[in-house]
Amino acid sequence: GELKEKKDLNVGWVHRNGRRYFFNHREEQVGTDQVKKVIDVSEHNGRISDWKKVIDDNGVDGVIVRLGYSGTEDKELAYNIKELNRLGIPYGVYLYTYAENETDAENDANQTIELLKKYKMNLSYPIYYDVENWEYVNKSKRAPSDTGTWVKIINKYMATMKQAGYQNVKVYSYRQLLQTRLNHPDILQHVNWVAAYTDALDWNNPHYSGEKGWQYTSSDYLKGIRGRVDVSVWY
């Protein structure tokens, strides 16, 4: 009896009556039956030789592709976009920032725009500015620690993107950072994709309403992709 009860827990992706639902580890439903399963990929996932199979075998609805990081293009970007375009798979993109100031943020935006044009991107999901607590390997540089600097950086990136005609631009970060140094209305209004590898998201953004994503794991295994994959529920 006990094993059966365990097996029937409503956790993760659950199929019922031809519909699909998502439950967190407290068995609380996230969103409705319209939730989407979204993965994000970069060169760290290696060469994904059969994108169609990845989508079909894993029930993936969308992909967020890494453009690269400040000043550098992701080695698999050209290939990933070519394949997603060819197969008509819905995607968005993200740029990991090493910005320390507004000049860096403007450079990040120009890099983003350049890559969007270079690969003729046809986006179904947003363009994400990936803001994390970065530091150089040798610790010679690290992310600004004060909220005010991040407000300036993010405002500058957003303004530069908007000026170039890009409207659907958002911020991705993780819960702990959003509760601390990124906890400012000017930043939170742009945040709709959040990482928290915990039983539940346990975070609410009063400054944004609309479709959003919870990246609930960085260590799922999907058929057709080597190594561990980030997976999000879109709701």
Regions found by a protein language model. Give the residues of each.
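Extracellular adhesion/carbohydrate-binding repeat motifs centered on closely spaced tryptophans
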Residues: 1-34
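Functionally critical loop-and-helix segments that line ligand-binding/catalytic clefts
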Residues: 31-43, 49, 57, 187-235
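Substrate-binding cleft of extracellular glycoside hydrolase catalytic domains
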Residues: 34-158, 162-164
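Conserved beta-strand positions
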Residues: 41, 65, 129-131, 171-174, ...
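Hydrophobic anchor at the start of a short beta-strand
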Residues: 91, 167-169, 192
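Glycine-rich, charge-decorated loop segments at or immediately adjacent to ligand/cofactor-binding or catalytic sites
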Residues: 104-107, 177-185
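Structural recognition of alpha->loop->beta junctions
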Residues: 113-128, 133, 182-209
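Aromatic-lined carbohydrate-recognition surfaces of secreted/lumenal glycan-active proteins
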Residues: 166-179
